[in-house]
Swiss-Prot record:
Residues annotated to bind a divalent metal cation: C121, C126, C160, C163
The organism's taxonomic lineage, starting at the top: Eukaryota, Fungi, Dikarya, Ascomycota, Saccharomycotina
One Gene Ontology CC term in the entry: cytoplasm
Protein name: 3-hydroxyanthranilate 3,4-dioxygenase
Family annotation (PANTHER family): 3-HYDROXYANTHRANILATE 3,4-DIOXYGENASE
Binding site for substrate: E54, R96, E106
Length: 171
């Protein structure tokens, strides 16, 4: 049976309390694609690597999408009202600010396709990969948060092998 349309302003009014750190997302529709509402502020340092594209729409306020584009670290600003399609396999870190709301649409992953969370060394002279966690993503609502908390709780995973700098899961 088809799901009824969702009135987004009404949903936000009634459910904004569901947008909790560290990811601040809530999956409102599933079925081939997952539609998430994402609030700010968030506090993450990981870069998500998704083998499928991700569609962003900034409903309220602006956000910064930190990406690694052909080996270069750069920021993409997505302003209120903007849409942006991030190609597959681009490491990205969505930075959301206080009192902002976005919608993200991701394709459900086929069996065997792995997502990854990657942390880079925070030392700008180094920027080597500190740790990467690959996993079969089945539940966007819980697995990203679990991977972040796992990284946060293990200093060995957070220590850069190249320069010794200790990374954190929050900026």
């Amino acid at each position: 049976m088809l799901q009824e349309p969702i009135n987004l302003p009404k949903w936000l009014e009634e459910n904004q309390h569901l947008l909790k750190p560290p990811v601040n997302n809530f999956c409102i529709q599933r079925g081939g694609y997952t539609v998430m509402i994402v609030g700010g502020p968030n506090a993450r340092t990981d870069y998500h690597i998704n083998q499928t594209p991700e569609w962003f729409h900034q409903k309220k306020g602006h956000m910064t999408l930190k990406v690694v584009d052909d080996g270069e670290f750069r920021d993409i600003t997505i302003n209120e009202g903007d849409i942006f399609l991030l190609p597959a396999n681009v490491p990205h870190n969505p930075v959301r600010y206080a009192d902002t709301i976005g919608v993200v649409v991701e394709q459900d992953r086929p069996e065997g396709m792995k997502d990854a969370l990657r942390w880079y060394c925070p030392n700008e002279k180094c920027r080597e990969i500190v740790f990467e966690n690959s996993f079969q993503l089945v539940d966007l609502g819980t697995q990203i948060k679990e991977a972040i908390l796992d990284f946060d709780g293990d200093i060995e995973k957070r220590t850069c092998k190249a320069c010794g700098t200790v990374a954190t899961s929050r900026p």
